[in-house]
Amino acid sequence: MDLTAQNRQDRQDRRDGREGRDGGVRPRIPSPVGATLAEPRTLRVGGGVLHVAMSGALAVVGPWTPDASTGCARCAGLWRRDVEGDTAPDRPVPGLFPLWADVFTGLADAAAHGPEELRLALVALDCRTGEVTRHRLVPHPDCSHCFPGGAGLAVPGGLDLRTPRPVVGDALRTRSMDRADLRARLLDFRFGPAAHIYRDEESPLSLVTCETVAPGHTRREGGYGRSTRFSDSEVPAFLEGVERVTGGHRHTGAPTVSGSYADLADEALDPERLGLHEPEWYGHPAFDLVPYSPDVPTSWVWGWSTLERRRILVPEHVAYWHAGTEGTRFLYESSNGCAVGGTLEEAVLYGLFEVVERDAFLLAWYSRTRLREIATGTDPDLAHLTDLLDERGLRLRLLDLTSDLGIPTALAVVTAPEEAVRSGLAPALSLATGTHLDPRRAVMAAVEETATNALMYPKWVRMRASVDVERCRPMLEDFTLVRTLEDHTGMHGLWESRRHWEFLVSPTATVPVEGFAAGRPSSFAGADLTALLRERLDAVHALGLDVVVVDQSSAPYTDAAGVRSVKVVVPGALPMTFGHTHRRTRSLERLTRASTLFEGGVPWERHGQVHPVPHPFP
């Protein structure tokens, strides 16, 4: 037999599972033609199954799934549908495969003899071009084969306030996150869950955006990272993407409880303590929720009351901000209080930071409280951003937004002169907040965000018409037209909006940055994060407020990204909402004494008066 004939015979032997030229027994490789990722063909090998299938023009080998493990071809099919949406192929294109059958057989043969290489991975052969690509795979939370009935999605281990959690380095984190590892585990342009990551070279800081796919919803959530280096910005961008996806919908497999508050009052959180909507907006075209009464049924999930130390039911659409459909939602909710961390305790601490930050801003905004200004000092990073703003004629003010909850909170306010606003170079007002136990980190978080928003405005207007403040002019006369985040920021970007926020540029006094930071640590080296969390919880409890924690952790994300996810809810704190008719301030007693909750706070007008003007929070 000549060499060509021998090669042909070897190929046939590999397909048929007979002995090849090297004397080894070749497993029979099933053909992918006629199989799909939803209904793959499999080969038992190495204590598991190797999947093969067609996905449009792609001939796919993998993943290899050990027995009793997760991550299969069906997961890959679900992710591809999520990533590509309506463009994802439903049917294979078998006519192209014969051209590449031998190549595919070689790939499959190699996989069969080293299946562990395709654990949570797959190889795709594009039958249009012959290109071979390798892809990482994360088990899909909606895969009924891997997680039947949601079994296996929950992450074991509840909130533990006794076990020490040592801080890594001098940052307030319990583990360091590696950019390369997150890229390898999360980023894949075909199979997600992070489908795309990109940088903005024109930003004053190294701005990175990560588009993370929401499982089962073909919607991408944006995660953002800002720092002095693009490589450093990728880590927070990846993690914020995970935070928004796990916080939007329930991927934990945990059961829900159906009923009204009246039915479940002994075990449930009273929605009135969360702040209700104003009845005047019930039935308004911009109000897309059900009017609340204790008899309105909805779905609930279990959380943990840190004050009462017991399980407590929380409305699912409060715990997960995208949850629920019309007819089941009576409260508008945002991602406020969602956070991720290397441990559950770390996630809770950062979720609490966010609730405190938003609550403080809304207290000051709706009460029109004048605040103390913080002198900028000589910090080189802060000076750099201040110089960039000065070059554009923009003015930066730092305000002390620290409330009675006692965590350092800074408000950065950037204002533009009339000429710059009229010419479209900048919005009249940009602002952002930051909260952290390290006052410098609080200040820098606020300044970095608002400086980026103000300086990038001309570019973003060119990219998205919705950013242009001019389109918001009618909103000054009719607040019900304010529906989205960009409406909120856009309306206050108009020069004519100044009367609504003049109190923010009229500070009561000036304190040195050292005064803002007095008694606060700048390094957490050697600290115990659990102890710090206990201190903050005790401080909140001392005010008669609870901190309710909903564990949003989902096993596929915890395994891939190494983080736990939570939603922190503080009944009595003001919730962040978007849309004028969605404001939730009714039944929140703290708002009536808001000006007294800030050191040096003075109401612009009358103490206790509430000004229901849409906020400018980004």
Q: Each predicted region: which residue ranges?
A:
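E1/E1-like adenylate-forming module used to activate ubiquitin-like modifiers
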Residues: 2-3, 24-103, 110-116, 144
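Compositionally biased, intrinsically disordered low-complexity segments enriched
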Residues: 6-22
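Helix-biased "structured C-terminal domain" signature
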Residues: 32-38, 42, 55, 116-618
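Generic signature of intrinsically disordered, low-complexity, basic-rich segments
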Residues: 106-108, 588
